[in-house]
C-alpha cells in the first residue's frame, strides 16, 4: 500500500484502453500496436474489481482506492454497476480519472454515492482552440464548465490536469 496524507491507499486498474485520439497521449499508440490482438477497450467485471479491492483492504488496511484507468466514465452501464457495488460493499473512498464531455447527472450521482474524492479530469489548456487543434482533445470550454458545475452540485471535489509551456 502507498500513503497519502497518512492514509494508506492502493492503485487499481478496472479497464485498459481509450477510444480517443488525443495527440499527446500514448494510449492510442497501444491501441494501434495491438489492433489485431483483441479489443481496444477492456473492462474487468465490476464485481471482480470490488472483490479485489475488498481483499486488498483486508490484507493491507487501505482507506482509499485510486484508479489509474485513462477514462473511468467511458462505459456508463459499467460505471453505474460498479459504483453501486462499491458503495454497498466497502466504506472506502475512491479517486478516478474522467472525461468531461461524457459526464452527466446520473454518472455524477453514482460517483458521489460511491464516495469519489476527488475525481480528476484533464482540461490541458484554457485555450479551446489549442486544446482541440494542437492537442486534438475535442473538448469545449462549455463541457468543462458543465462538468465543474456537476461536481459542485454533488459536492464532489475535483482536480484538473493542465499542461504548461505549450506553443503560443
Regions found by a protein language model. Give the residues of each.
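Active-site glycine- and acidic-residue-rich loops that bind
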Residues: 168
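Radical SAM [4Fe-4S] cluster-binding motif and immediate context
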Residues: 1-164
Amino acid at each position: 500500500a502507498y500513503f497519502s496524507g497518512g492514509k494508506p491507499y492502493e492503485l487499481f486498474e478496472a479497464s485498459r484502453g481509450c477510444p480517443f485520439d488525443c495527440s499527446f497521449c500514448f494510449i492510442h499508440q497501444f491501441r494501434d500496436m495491438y489492433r489485431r490482438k483483441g479489443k481496444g477497450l477492456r473492462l474487468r467485471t465490476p464485481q471482480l474489481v470490488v472483490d479485489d479491492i475488498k481483499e486488498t483492504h483486508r490484507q493491507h488496511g487501505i482507506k482509499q482506492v485510486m484508479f489509474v484507468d485513462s477514462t473511468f466514465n467511458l462505459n456508463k452501464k459499467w460505471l453505474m454497476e460498479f459504483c453501486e457495488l462499491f458503495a454497498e460493499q466497502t466504506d472506502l473512498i475512491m479517486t478516478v480519472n474522467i472525461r468531461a464531455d461524457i459526464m452527466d447527472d446520473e454518472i455524477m450521482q453514482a460517483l458521489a454515492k460511491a464516495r469519489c474524492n476527488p475525481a480528476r479530469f484533464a482540461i490541458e489548456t484554457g485555450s479551446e482552440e489549442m486544446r482541440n487543434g494542437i492537442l486534438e482533445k475535442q473538448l469545449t470550454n462549455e463541457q468543462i464548465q458543465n462538468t465543474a458545475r456537476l461536481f459542485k452540485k454533488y459536492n464532489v471535489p475535483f482536480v484538473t490536469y493542465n499542461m504548461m509551456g505549450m506553443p503560443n
